[in-house]
Each structure stands twice: as structure tokens, then as C-alpha cells.
Amino acid sequence: MKNKYNLLFFLFLLCYGDVALAACTGKLKISPGYSGHTYSFDSSIPNNSNIARYLVEISEKIVCDADQSGWDGKRYAQLHLYSSGALCESVSGDGITFRSNVSGLSWRFPNGIPYHCAAGQINLGGIKYADRNGKVTWNPGELRHEIFLRVDNRFDFSKSRTFSVNTISGRGGLGGDSSVVIPLIGSSFNYSYSNIATCTLTGPSEVNFNTVTTSDVLKGTTHRDLNLRAECRNRGASLGLNFKFEPQYKDVSANKQGVFYAKNTSGSLTYKLTKKADASAIPLNEFVKLIVEDKVNIHTGNTIPLLLTLQKGDGKIATGKIETFLNVTMEHM
């Protein structure tokens, strides 16, 4: 019976390879694909985009005892990467990813690399046969895999900041003897992120006052709706904006009551800008800080209801129209 089990064990080794322990020297490394360890990106980047490129390479010559045997008795080994952090996730049509220490950022291995997600195992190369001494050698420059830092919609785009992303934690090893440790050298990489917003603020191309009469002007009751629509391409939940109203007329002055004057052929006319259903004037000699002063968050696609009121100027009849009345500048707060 004992001989029977010895024979079965011999057949197992013959069929499935020698699983004897193997020793290795050398190191792997993860380094930036371009010079430097600092990168920047902003909120205009599309979802599921690569922020930066990195390389998995051999930093010191790796020499290992061959840990597997083929049907022909030849000894060989395969280099693997074993992740000790989050297990990998398969991304349909786009390889696999390992989550990083920053939510929404992950390390992506592109398609074509054999992997075993349940074991956190990546195959870094094909079979390499041993020399006459039973050793398998990989030299610097012989192995080179591109990986990418990828951003997805889990990333917090609500504010600008700087942060560090750690490399994939783990080690190199062999395909047969999973106990072999080949050091994986890496570090944290610094990123600066700015939440810029690409925005346009649209409104009527003209505000027409052709129907205004002298009595209307004297009463100060004439007004026109001025609905401004914010169309922004930013990745935050909401965007606080500064609005700076700049009439195209050059001879413009403003007072602390939020009234400004624009001269045209009819004389000096007075306009007051207010929030709809609120008689208080918005100061036009400063930025109109909707997010700070009026507690309004502007979301993409929201309409900002404002009124442009024509008031008493120099007593002359106010006719005509104001074309392209507003130039608007915006910035993230």
C-alpha cells in the first residue's frame, strides 16, 4: 500500500509539475511611466479615464529556482504579481483593476494579461525554462508592463485638493510556489486635483423695452424677466459661482444700492437687478455671490430667475432695447 501511494505521488508530480519550494533573488518595481512622481488633473476629465501611466519592471536581476516541470521533464518558472490589498475587479472589455487607497481611483491592468482575481494574482510573463543548473533568470528590461491609474465616478469631485496615491501593495512570486517572495518596490505618488468648471450662462440675447412709457419710467415699475440658465460641465454635486455683471457700455457707474447707469441715445437710464420675488437690489458694484450671500447652489441646468427693472433716469422716455446685456464670468468657490 505504501508503494502504491508513492507511485501516485510520483505521477502527480509528473503530471502537474514539481511544487518543491523555490528560492529567488532580485526585485520588481512600479514607477511612473514619465519622469516625476507628481501629476495633476481636473474635473473636466471623463469618467473611467486614465490619469497617468506606470510601469511594472525588473529593478534588479531576478534569479529563481525553477519551481515547475512540464510533461517533457523540462523545468520552468513563471513570474507573477500577488496583490495583498483589495482583490481585483474585472472591467468589461477594459482589463482588470485594483482599488487604491483613494476612493474612485484604481490601478488598471489592460486587456491581455492573464489573471486570477480571486487570488489577487497577475501573470507577468510566459513560461521561462531553467538553465542546466535549474535556475531561471529575468534581466532588467526583459519584462515591462504598462498599468494605469484610472478615475471613476466614486471619486469626490466636490473640492480642489492634493493627495497621495499608494502603489499596488503586494509582492512578486512564482506560479507554482506561491510562497516565494520577490520584493515589489513602489511608493506613494502625489496628485493635485482642481475642480474647474467649464460653464456657460445663457440668457436672452436682448431685453426689449420698446413698450415702456414715460409714466412707467417715473413709477419705476417696469421690469423684464431675465432668466439665466447655468450649463456647467463640472463633476461636483453642485457648483457655487460668482457672477460679475459687466454691461458692455463703457461709461458705467454703480452705487451701493445696486443701481447702475448705462447711457444710450435716450439719455441716462437706470437699471436695477434683483432676485425674482425679492425687492432688495443685488449689489452690482461687487460680485454677486449667490452661493454666499443668498444661499443658492447652482446645479447644472438650473435657471436663475432675475428681474431687470427700468427705473427713473433723467426723466426722458426710455425706449429701445439693450442687446447682449450681460457678460458673465464664473469661478469655482
UniProtKB/Swiss-Prot annotation:
The keyword Signal applies. The keyword Transcription regulation does not apply. Keywords: Disulfide bond, Fimbrium, Plasmid, Signal. Residues 1-22 form the signal peptide. InterPro entries: Adhesion_dom_sf. One of its GO terms (cellular component) is pilus. Three disulfide bonds are present. It comes from the Bacteria. It is found in: Fimbrium. Minor component of K99 fimbriae. Is not required for binding of K99 fimbriae to the ganglioside receptor. May play a role in initiation, elongation and flexibility of the fimbriae. Requires the FanE protein for its stability. This is Protein FanF. The lineage of its organism: Bacteria, Pseudomonadati, Pseudomonadota, Gammaproteobacteria, Enterobacterales.
